UniProtKB/Swiss-Prot annotation:
The lineage of its organism: Eukaryota, Viridiplantae, Streptophyta, Embryophyta, Tracheophyta. It holds the Pfam family PsaA_PsaB. PsaA and PsaB bind P700, the primary electron donor of photosystem I (PSI), as well as the electron acceptors A0, A1 and FX. PSI is a plastocyanin-ferredoxin oxidoreductase, converting photonic excitation into a charge separation, which transfers an electron from the donor P700 chlorophyll pair to the spectroscopically characterized acceptors A0, A1, FX, FA and FB in turn. Oxidized P700 is reduced on the lumenal side of the thylakoid membrane by plastocyanin. Chlorophyll a B1 binds at H654. Belongs to the PsaA/PsaB family. It catalyses: reduced [plastocyanin] + hnu + oxidized [2Fe-2S]-[ferredoxin] = oxidized [plastocyanin] + reduced [2Fe-2S]-[ferredoxin]. The keyword Oxidoreductase applies. This is Photosystem I P700 chlorophyll a apoprotein A2. GO terms for molecular function: 4 iron, 4 sulfur cluster binding; chlorophyll binding; electron transfer activity; magnesium ion binding; oxidoreductase activity. GO terms for biological process: photosynthesis. Keywords: 4Fe-4S, Chlorophyll, Chloroplast, Chromophore, Electron transport, Iron, Iron-sulfur, Magnesium, Membrane, Metal-binding, Oxidoreductase, Photosynthesis, Photosystem I, Plastid, Thylakoid, Transmembrane, Transmembrane helix, Transport. Its main location: plastid. The PsaA/B heterodimer binds the P700 chlorophyll special pair and subsequent electron acceptors. PSI consists of a core antenna complex that captures photons, and an electron transfer chain that converts photonic excitation into a charge separation. The eukaryotic PSI reaction center is composed of at least 11 subunits. Disulfide bonds: none annotated.
C-alpha cells in the first residue's frame, strides 16, 4: 500500500476524509501518540528538535544583524541616538507611488525603510558594537552557530550519537550542567564581555580581537583581585557628566554599586550591570555543584524530597513520590519550565521600562511601549501553556498509587476548596471594580463628577515610600532620612537610587492615585479569573463529580455524545481555550494602563490620565478613541503619510479578529451542508470538474474549529493593538 500522510499514524492515514490532513497536522508534534513510539525515541526526538529550535533562533537573530548592517543606519544613529531614527531594513514594494516613497523614506535613507522599534540599536550600542563591520561579523558568527545547531540536531538522531534514556533521566547531572554551565559560565562570560569590551567602548576605547590582549580593562589589571583588595575595582566610577561613548567624564571602575541611572543615557550604569552579572555567575557556579552525581558528594534530590515530611502531619506524606512523578513526566517538566519562563518574561516587561538597561532606550518611547507590550503578551501565552501541560500530565502521566497522600494528591483532594475560593475572589473583584467604574461613569454622565467614589491606594503608596519615594509624605524606611535603613546604604548605592526614585523623568515608582487603584483591581480580576479557569481545567482534568471517568476521554474531547448531556465544554482543552480569551482580555487592560499612563507622562499632562481613568467613558474616549484618531486618518484626500501602513494593519487586524467569530459561533452541521453543496457544484462545473481529490471533504471538528477561531481572535486582537500602539506613540513622539 502506498504511504500517505501522516506516516506516524496508520489509522489516520487510512481515513477516507479530509480529517486525515487536519488531524495529521494537529498531532504531528504529539510524539507520544505516534504509532511506533517508545519512551527512548520520544526523548531523542524532543532533544533533536531543541537543536532545530536553536538553529531557527540563531538564523533569525543573524538576519536582524545582517539587515541592519546592510540597509540600516547604525553608524549614523550612534552619532546622535536621540534624533536619528534607527532603520530596521529597507522596503521594496511595487505598489508604492511617489507619495508612498516619500512617506517611508526616513532616517536619512535613500529610499523607503522600516523604522526599528525593537531596541536592538540601543542594545548593540550598549554592549560595545560600533560599526557595520561589527554587525556583519556578529551575523556571520550566528549563522555559523545556526549551522552547527542543525548538524547537532541531525547528529543526535544517528544511532551512534543517540543519548540513552538513562542519560535523559539523570536529573542531578542535568541540573548541575544547566546551573553552572548554562547560567553560571554564560553569566561569567557576559561579565567578561562587559568588562573587556562594553565598558571600554562606553569610555571611547575600541577593543577588538587585534588589541584585546593589550588593553587592560582596569589600570591595575588583576592586581586587586589577587591581593584581595576587591574594593579597588569600584573606585573612580564614571562621573555624572560622563558622555557615553567618549572619555569625557569617564572613570576607571569596572564593578560598582552606584544605583540609579546614568544621567545622559537614562539607563543603568554599565559597571553596576557587570557587577550584577558577576554576582549571578558566582551564585550559579556554586549552585551547579550542589547535586550528587558520580562523585558521591552533594544532595540527592530524591533524598531531599523523601526527607521533607512536614511536622504535625498537616501535609500528609509531604513530597514522597514526587521525584519519580516529575522525572518520568515530560509534561510536568514542561509545565514547570513554562510557568517559570512565563513569570520571567513578564518580569522582563516590567523591568525593561522601569530599570532600562540599554543606553538611550528610555528616551525612545515607541520602543519602550512596543517592548513592554510584546513581553506581556508572550508571557500570557507561555503561562497558559504551563497549565495546559499540567492538565495533560494529570491525564497521561499521573499515577495515584505513586503519589498517595503527598502534596500533589492533596491538591486534587481539596480541589473544590481551591476552585471555589478562586471563584469567590473573582466574583468579589469583578462586581466591586465594575461597580465603582459604573458608578463613576454615571456621575460623570449626570454632570456631578464630585460624587465619584475615588479611593487612594494608600498601601501601595506606603510601599513606594518604604522604597524611598518622598512625594506622599510617609516618613518610613528609605524615605525616612534619619532611619537605620537609610543610613546603612548611604555610602553604597542609596544616593543614586533615591535620586532615580524621586526624579519624575523616569518610570520608577510612578505616582499613583484613584485611577491606578481601579485599574489595578480590574487587572487583578482578569488575573484571578484566568487562573480560575486554568486551575479548574487542570484539577478537573482526570475527572469531576459530573464526569468521573474524564481521563479516559483524553485531553481534548468535545462531548461524550448525547447520552451524557452536559459533558460538552468540560475537557481540559476547553479550559485552556476559554482561559486564552481571559488572558488576552487581562493583558489588554495591562497594556492599555501602561500605555496611557506613559503617554501622559511623556507628554507632561499626567492629569489627563488621573482625571479620565476613573470612569469607563474616560478610557473609551480619552485613551482608545483619542489615540486611534491618527490611525483612522492614515489615508485622506491629501495623500498618505508614514502611519498609513499602521492604519492598514489596524483595519486588517480588525478583519482577522472578526473572522475568528465565524469559526467560534457556528458548528459543524452548517458547514457540512455548505461543503456538500459546493462539492456538488464543483463536480458539475466544466473545466473545474477536471480537478478531483481522493478525500471526502468534511467540516472541521468542534475542537478544531475552536482552535482556528481562537487563533484568528488572538492574532487579530494583537495585530490591532500593535498597530494602534506603534502608530499612536510614534505619531506623537517620532
Amino acid at each position: 500500500m502506498e504511504l500517505r500522510f501522516p506516516r506516524f499514524s496508520q489509522g489516520l492515514a487510512q481515513d477516507p476524509t479530509t480529517r486525515r490532513i487536519w488531524f495529521g497536522i494537529a498531532t504531528a508534534h504529539d510524539f507520544e501518540s505516534h504509532d511506533d513510539i517508545t519512551e527512548e525515541r520520544l526523548y531523542q526526538n524532543i532533544f533533536a528538535s531543541h537543536f532545530g529550535q536553536l538553529a531557527i533562533i540563531f538564523l533569525w537573530t543573524s538576519g536582524n544583524l545582517f539587515h541592519v548592517a546592510w540597509q540600516g543606519n547604525f553608524e549614523s544613529w550612534i552619532q546622535d541616538p536621540l534624533h536619528v531614527r534607527p532603520i530596521a531594513h529597507a522596503i521594496w514594494d511595487p505598489h508604492f507611488g511617489q507619495p508612498a516613497v516619500e512617506a517611508f523614506t526616513r532616517g536619512g535613507a535613500a529610499g523607503p525603510v522600516n523604522i526599528a522599534y525593537s531596541g536592538v540599536y540601543q542594545w548593540w550600542y550598549t554592549i560595545g558594537l560600533r560599526t557595520n563591520e561589527d554587525l556583519y561579523t556578529g551575523a556571520l558568527f550566528l549563522l555559523f552557530l545556526s549551522t552547527l545547531s542543525l548538524i547537532a540536531s541531525w547528529l543526535h538522531l544517528q544511532p551512534k550519537w543517540k543519548p540513552s534514556l538513562s542519560w535523559f533521566k539523570n536529573a542531578e547531572s542535568r541540573l548541575n550542567h544547566h546551573l553552572s554551565g548554562l547560567f553560571g559560565v554564560s553569566s561569567l562570560a557576559w561579565t567578561g564581555h562587559l568588562v573587556h569590551v562594553a565598558i571600554p567602548a562606553s569610555r571611547g576605547e575600541y577593543v577588538r580581537w587585534n588589541n584585546f590582549l593589550d588593553v587592560l580593562p582596569y589600570p591595575q589589571g588583576l592586581g586587586p583581585l589577587l591581593t584581595g583588595q576587591w574594593n579597588l575595582y569600584a573606585q573612580n566610577p564614571d562621573s555624572s557628566n560622563h558622555l557615553f561613548g567618549t572619555a569625557q567624564g569617564a572613570g576607571t571602575a569596572i564593578l560598582t554599586l552606584l544605583g540609579g541611572f546614568h544621567p545622559q543615557t537614562q539607563s543603568l550604569w554599565l559597571t553596576d550591570m557587570a557587577h550584577h552579572h558577576l554576582a549571578i555567575a558566582f551564585i550559579f557556579l556554586i549552585a551547579g555543584h550542589m547535586y550528587r552525581t558520580n562523585f558521591g558528594i552533594g544532595h540527592s534530590i530524591k533524598d531531599l524530597l523523601e526527607a521533607h515530611t512536614p511536622p504535625g502531619g498537616r501535609l500528609g506524606r509531604g513530597h514522597k513520590g514526587l521525584y519519580d512523578t516529575i522525572n518520568n513526566s515530560i509534561h510536568f517538566q514542561l509545565g514547570l519550565a513554562l510557568a517559570s519562563l512565563g513569570v520571567i518574561t513578564s518580569l522582563v516587561a516590567q523591568h525593561m521600562y522601569s530599570l532600562p538597561p540599554y543606553a538611550f532606550i528610555a528616551q525612545d518611547f515607541t520602543t519602550q511601549a512596543a517592548l513592554y507590550t510584546h513581553h506581556q503578551y508572550i508571557a500570557g501565552f507561555i503561562m497558559t501553556g504551563a497549565f495546559a501541560h499540567g492538565a495533560i500530565f494529570f491525564i497521561r502521566d499521573y499515577n495515584p498509587e505513586q503519589n498517595e497522600d503527598n502534596v500533589l494528591a492533596r491538591m486534587l483532594d481539596h480541589k473544590e476548596a481551591i476552585i471555589s475560593h478562586l471563584s469567590w475572589a473573582s466574583l468579589f473583584l469583578g462586581f466591586h471594580t465594575l461597580g465603582l467604574y459604573v458608578h463613576n461613569d454615571v456621575m460623570l454622565a449626570f454632570g456631578t463628577p464630585e460624587k465619584q467614589i475615588l479611593i487612594e491606594p494608600i498601601f501601595a503608596q506606603w510601599i513606594q515610600s518604604a522604597h524611598g519615594k518622598t512625594t506622599y509624605g510617609f516618613d518610613i524606611l528609605l524615605s525616612s532620612t534619619n532611619g537605620p535603613a537609610f543610613n546603612a546604604g548611604r555610602s553604597l548605592w542609596l544616593p543614586g537610587w533615591l535620586n532615580a526614585v524621586n526624579e519624575n523623568s523616569n518610570s520608577l515608582f510612578l505616582t499613583i492615585g484613584p485611577g491606578d487603584f481601579l485599574v489595578h483591581h480590574a487587572i487583578a480580576l482578569g488575573l484571578h479569573t484566568t487562573t480560575l479557569i486554568l486551575v479548574k481545567g487542570a484539577l478537573d482534568a482526570r475527572g469531576s463529580k459530573l464526569m468521573p471517568d474524564k481521563k479516559d476521554f483524553g485531553y481534548s474531547f468535545p462531548c461524550d455524545g448525547p447520552g451524557r448531556g452536559g459533558t460538552c465544554d468540560i475537557s481540559a482543552w476547553d479550559a485552556f481555550y476559554l482561559a486564552v480569551f481571559w488572558m488576552l482580555n487581562t493583558i489588554g487592560w495591562v497594556t492599555f494602563y501602561w500605555h496611557w499612563k506613559h503617554i501622559t507622562l511623556w507628554q507632561g499632562n499626567v492629569s489627563q490620565f488621573n482625571e479620565s481613568s476613573t470612569y469607563l467613558m474616560g478610557w473609551l474616549r480619552d485613551y482608545l478613541w483619542l489615540n486611534s484618531s491618527q490611525l483612522i486618518n492614515g489615508y485622506n484626500p491629501f495623500g498618505m503619510n508614514s502611519l498609513s501602513v499602521w492604519a492598514w494593519m489596524f483595519l486588517f487586524g480588525h478583519l482577522v479578529w472578526a473572522t475568528g467569530f465565524m469559526f467560534l459561533i457556528s458548528w459543524r452541521g452548517y458547514w457540512q451542508e455548505l461543503i456538500e453543496t459546493l462539492a456538488w457544484a464543483h463536480e458539475r462545473t466544466p473545466l473545474a470538474n477536471l480537478i478531483r481529490w481522493r478525500d471526502k471533504p468534511v467540516a472541521l471538528s468542534i475542537v478544531q474549529a475552536r482552535l482556528v477561531g481562537l487563533a484568528h481572535f488572538s492574532v487579530g486582537y494583537i495585530f490591532t493593538y500593535a498597530a494602534f500602539l506603534i502608530a499612536s506613540t510614534s505619531g506623537k513622539f517620532g
